A protein has these predicted regions:
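Short, glycine- and small/hydrophobic-rich beta-strand elements in well-ordered beta-sheets
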Residues: 36-42
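Conserved G/P- and acidic residue-centered "switch" motifs that form tight phosphate/ATP-binding loops
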Residues: 44, 58
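Catalytic core of pol beta-like nucleotidyltransferases
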Residues: 1-36, 47-54, 64-175
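Short beta-strand->loop micro-motif that forms the acidic, two-metal-ion catalytic signature
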Residues: 59-63
Length: 175
């Protein structure tokens, strides 16, 4: 059966009330990070459109001139998060318990194909993407997966990937 690359580009593909807070987050990132913001990508249940009221918002943020420390990167994100706190608190008062779960990578780190990208080729929403950086990463990965004959198999509400149909034990598959 295979898979069809079907990630989307544009915040309009995110359902409310998440869309408003993600637009606010995008604007805050642009304001604080400026030209150092490369990409903002939403993935997971919010991107798929099946988020619950208590779902976290999974984010991939790609930036330039980031500190090496993961904790320092999170501090940079917290600076941005403070700017959207009123939006988040407003949603909490409406019964939407939103928390952000960011993965923050520099450009070189983001270029390397990561297992988390597998599902992104199918259901991510790219909200901001300077010079189509992350779109190119996902297109490259999609091409590789299609060349391998990869399949995303569904079992009830869950799924898994078969990267190569004729896989032999011990064989290394590079994506």
């Amino acid at each position: 059966m295979g898979f069809t690359p079907s990630y989307k580009v544009g915040v309009e593909f995110i359902n409310e009330p998440y869309r408003s807070v993600i637009q606010g987050l995008r604007n805050a990132l642009i304001s604080v990070w400026g030209d150092n913001l490369v990409s903002l990508v939403v993935f997971g249940s919010v991107a798929r459109g099946d988020a619950r009221r208590d779902s976290d918002v999974d984010l991939l943020i790609v930036g330039k001139q980031l500190p090496k420390s993961r904790f320092k990167r999170l501090e940079l994100f917290e600076e941005v998060e403070k700017l959207v706190e009123p939006l988040v608190e407003g949603l909490w008062s409406q019964g939407y318990y939103i928390d952000f779960t960011p993965i923050i990578l520099d450009v070189e780190e983001a270029r390397r194909h990561r297992p988390i990208y597998l599902d992104m080729v199918v259901d991510a929403v790219i909200v901001f993407d300077r010079d189509d950086f992350f779109r190119k990463v996902l297109d490259e990965l999609s091409s590789r997966l299609l060349a391998l004959g990869a399949e995303r198999k569904r079992v009830g509400k869950l799924w898994y990937w078969v990267l190569k149909k004729d896989y032999r034990p011990g064989e290394v598959i590079e994506i």
